[in-house]
């Protein structure tokens, strides 16, 4: 089963959120924008700004941990600008 590493952006919060999933990305985004607890529950305007596919959930999680370790908005924005998101998300 394949998995995805993704970065979401909220205009309301002006913040990025990184995550990984084995689910369909459209469905995962819908759940992030639904009223739920957790960081992404603070607003419902999240959009996918970056996504990478991986052969396993472990690989996607490793990528998420790497990007989070940067602790750098500048590096995240550079990654996004060099690799725009797929159309339709």
Report the location of each language-model feature:
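GIY-YIG nuclease catalytic motif and its immediate N-terminal context
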Residues: 1-37, 41-51, 58-68, 72, ...
């Amino acid at each position: 089963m394949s998995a995805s590493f993704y970065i979401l952006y909220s205009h309301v919060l002006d913040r990025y959120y990184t995550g990984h999933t084995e689910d369909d990305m459209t469905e995962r985004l819908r759940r992030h924008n639904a009223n739920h607890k957790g960081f992404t529950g603070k607003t419902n305007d999240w959009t996918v700004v970056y996504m990478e596919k991986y052969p396993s959930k472990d690989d996607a999680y490793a990528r998420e941990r790497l990007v989070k370790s940067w602790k750098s908005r500048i590096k995240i924005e550079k990654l996004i600008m060099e690799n725009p998101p797929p159309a339709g998300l």
